Design a protein with these regions (language model features):
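Acidic, low-complexity proline/glycine-rich segments
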Residues: 4-22
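N-terminal glycine-rich anion-binding loops that anchor highly charged ligand groups
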Residues: 19-22, 49, 61-68
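Generic N-terminal amphipathic, Lys/Arg-enriched alpha-helix
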Residues: 19-36
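A glycine-/small-polar-enriched, mobile loop at the entrance of the PLP active site in fold-type I
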Residues: 31-40, 59-63
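Alpha-helical packing segments of well-folded alpha/beta enzyme cores
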Residues: 43-46, 50
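Active-site-proximal beta-alpha core segment in soluble small-molecule metabolic enzymes
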Residues: 59-229
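Acidic, glycine-rich loop-and-beta core segments that form the ion-binding/anion-interacting portion
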Residues: 213-252
Length: 252
């Protein structure tokens, strides 16, 4: 599977050109410390895998800067991605400045009123966490020409062993449940939306996505046809050897 998907392992990975063909182990004593050593050729290979998924499905794949914000390598990733995902003002600015010409998508659990106007200078898509948040900030974003989304909670847990990080765990305040939607989303707020967003996975395979999508369709299926886009969130371990790329593409 690794060869079919074009994924390197430790034996087939080419030398990192920045180290002139030598392994990092050979040069440890000459490197400044502490430091990170990144294999740019492997990074680009992963980018190619993502770009092929986007080409075959028509989806957009974004760089989650919360997970990787080494902006020196943004030029290496930019050709393969539609843009960046940010969790606040400074990540949005980073994506806009270091990956120019690409989209900037923002989701934040809580937006600061004193930062929101500046955030609008960088963001293309803004996702809100709750109907109340949407009501407070949505029209400011809409009038600025931004694409507006709402994060939903499909109430479908696919993770084991770390409930504290599970957005679908009981009591989670991340995303809007269907009950909250029915009780708080007025026709005026629904009309404001361009899309909906969910984020429930963490380094998981396409099986978990497939299960989550069934829950999304079950709870929000009547909403989906009225939306322009659906954001699958992060946590998809697409470049991992053995990841079921065909199933991912079928889900999309």
């Amino acid at each position: 599977i690794g060869e079919v998907m074009g994924i390197f392992n430790k034996d087939t990975r080419p030398p990192f050109s920045g180290l002139k063909g030598r392994s990092p182990k050979e040069l440890f004593h000459t490197l400044p410390t502490p430091c990170y050593i990144l294999d740019e050729s492997a990074l680009q290979k992963n980018g190619q895998i993502l770009a092929k998924v986007a080409q075959r499905t028509g989806c957009k794949i974004l760089l989650a800067q919360k997970a990787f914000s080494n902006y020196n390598l943004y030029p290496s990733l930019s050709p393969y991605l539609a843009g960046t995902e940010a969790s606040g003002l400074y990540e949005a600015r980073l994506g806009a400045e270091e990956m120019p010409g690409k989209e900037v998508h923002v989701f934040c659990g809580a937006y600061r009123e004193d930062e929101f106007s500046e955030l609008l200078c960088y963001a293309d898509h803004i996702v809100f966490n709750s109907p109340r948040q949407l009501e407070r900030f949505g029209w400011l974003a809409k009038n600025a020409g931004k694409s507006i989304g709402l994060r939903i909670n499909p109430e479908c847990s696919t993770q084991e062993g770390h409930d504290i990080y599970d957005p679908c765990a009981p009591g989670s305040r991340l995303g809007t449940t269907r009950a909250q939607w029915d009780g708080q989303m007025t026709p005026r707020l629904v009309e404001m939306l361009d899309g909906i967003h969910f984020h429930t996975l963490c380094e998981q395979d396409a099986d978990a996505l497939e299960l989550t999508l069934k829950a999304v369709e079950n709870l929000f299926g009547d909403i989906l046809p009225r939306m322009k886009w659906l954001n699958f969130g992060g946590g998809h371990h697409i470049t991992r050897p053995g990841y079921d790329v065909p199933k991912l593409e079928q889900c999309i």
